[in-house]
Regions:
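Short intrinsically disordered terminal tails
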Residues: 1, 63-67, 120-122
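Active-site scaffold of zinc-dependent metalloenzymes
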Residues: 1-48, 59, 63
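Long, well-structured alpha-helical subdomains associated
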Residues: 6-7, 43-46, 91-122
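Short secondary-structure boundary/hinge segments and terminal tails
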Residues: 31-33, 69, 112
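Acidic/histidine-rich
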Residues: 51
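Histidine-centered divalent metal-coordination motifs
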Residues: 54, 58
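Post-HEXXH active-site segment of zinc metalloproteases
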Residues: 62-92
Length: 122
């Protein structure tokens, strides 16, 4: 589903307000890094809007000293909690910006399945 450029850029502006640069690149994985960059395709889809908001959720935790990036890489139990936190931040952000949430649950469910790789999570 397509959203307007204006709505998508509202989300991107939140990252910029937090001191994080949004880099548009469809050849790289959607991600946040501790150099304060989020990479996302320049495509105005609801899926990309959800993904961008999720990465901003990581930024929020990082700037509030609530995300240990090294632990995120090496501890699957920690990662699951960090991912859930980012999704909660994303939901609140999207709701505040009045981005449609009718595909939110199915999107998040499909992404969360990737984090539950047992026995690594236990």
């Amino acid at each position: 589903m397509i959203i307007s450029r204006e709505k998508f850029m509202k989300i991107a502006n939140v990252a910029e307000e937090l001191g994080c640069k949004v880099v548009y690149d469809s050849t790289k994985k959607i991600s946040f890094n501790t150099r304060m960059y989020i990479t996302v395709p320049y495509e105005f889809t609801l899926e990309n809007a959800y993904a961008l908001a999720h990465e901003i959720g990581h930024v929020i935790d990082y700037v509030n000293d609530e995300l240990d990036h090294d632990k995120w890489f090496h501890d699957w139990s920690y990662r699951v909690n960090a991912e859930m936190s980012a999704w909660v931040h994303a939901y609140k952000l999207l709701e505040k910006l009045e981005i449609p949430l009718h595909h939110w649950q199915s999107h998040v469910n499909s992404k969360l399945a990737n984090y539950f790789i047992l026995p690594k999570v236990i």
